[in-house]
Swiss-Prot record:
<dbReference type="GO" id="GO:0009416">
    <property type="term" value="P:response to light stimulus"/>
</dbReference>
<keyword id="KW-0217">Developmental protein</keyword>
<feature type="domain" description="ALOG">
    <location>
        <begin position="80"/>
        <end position="207"/>
    </location>
</feature>
<keyword id="KW-0804">Transcription</keyword>
<feature type="compositionally biased region" description="Low complexity">
    <location>
        <begin position="212"/>
        <end position="224"/>
    </location>
</feature>
<feature type="region of interest" description="Disordered">
    <location>
        <begin position="50"/>
        <end position="84"/>
    </location>
</feature>
<comment type="similarity">
    <text>Belongs to the plant homeotic and developmental regulators ALOG protein family.</text>
</comment>
<dbReference type="GO" id="GO:0009299">
    <property type="term" value="P:mRNA transcription"/>
</dbReference>
<keyword id="KW-0238">DNA-binding</keyword>
<feature type="compositionally biased region" description="Low complexity">
    <location>
        <begin position="239"/>
        <end position="248"/>
    </location>
</feature>
<keyword id="KW-0805">Transcription regulation</keyword>
<feature type="compositionally biased region" description="Gly residues">
    <location>
        <begin position="17"/>
        <end position="32"/>
    </location>
</feature>
<feature type="region of interest" description="Disordered">
    <location>
        <begin position="1"/>
        <end position="35"/>
    </location>
</feature>
<comment type="subunit">
    <text>Homodimer.</text>
</comment>
<dbReference type="GO" id="GO:0042803">
    <property type="term" value="F:protein homodimerization activity"/>
</dbReference>
<feature type="compositionally biased region" description="Gly residues">
    <location>
        <begin position="60"/>
        <end position="69"/>
    </location>
</feature>
<dbReference type="GO" id="GO:0090698">
    <property type="term" value="P:post-embryonic plant morphogenesis"/>
</dbReference>
Amino acid sequence: MDRHHHHHHHHHHHMMSGGGQDPAAGDGGAGGATQDSFFLGPAAAAMFSGAGSSSSGAGTSAGGGGGGPSPSSSSPSLSRYESQKRRDWNTFGQYLRNHRPPLSLSRCSGAHVLEFLKYMDQFGKTKVHTPVCPFYGHPNPPAPCPCPLRQAWGSLDALIGRLRAAYEENGGTPEMNPFGARAVRLYLREVRETQARARGISYEKKKRKKPSSAGAGAGPSSEGSPPPPGGSASGGGDTSASPQFIIP
């Protein structure tokens, strides 16, 4: 008994010496969470889901937290919009690093941004029917078809809004901003029209009719829902406003 007590005391002492470490361990736990979510950023999965599912992914994680404390405690300073913006910026940075021939941010043009958006399509989750498909123009196709999956227009629009802001936050000038290039705006408009026709949906109607319900209620279709409240002009600004509005 005595010996056991001694052993216990020793163990306790060890824990106390670790006691200085215990808060650190707790801290490490939170740090682990922070680091984990940071690690997720550049990691393939989060990147690949890109703009498309990340908006719904962010929705689920925030919703899953439910209480709010857990998501916010892991990253107290960053809103969902800010952390998504950082992830997108990392994704674009990685795209530049892997680019052949090498491409620096300063030499990046609207054409390169379009190249990046087309590259992101391979990680999209939105089926866009081709005109020869029997389901072309059907909002809810009754059966599977071989049409390609793409990034939804709303995802690309929000992605460009975030990257446009990140570019200027990282020292770029507005007049040099490749994400604000006319070619990019025209491309987004074209994608919106193409997808609206292919999927048999109208973005215009949605935009006016239910900005609030689309933001709050449309969980599964969150791919398309974040952008409608803001036009493509202020897509970035609005996406930043709406998630912060939803979380509290």
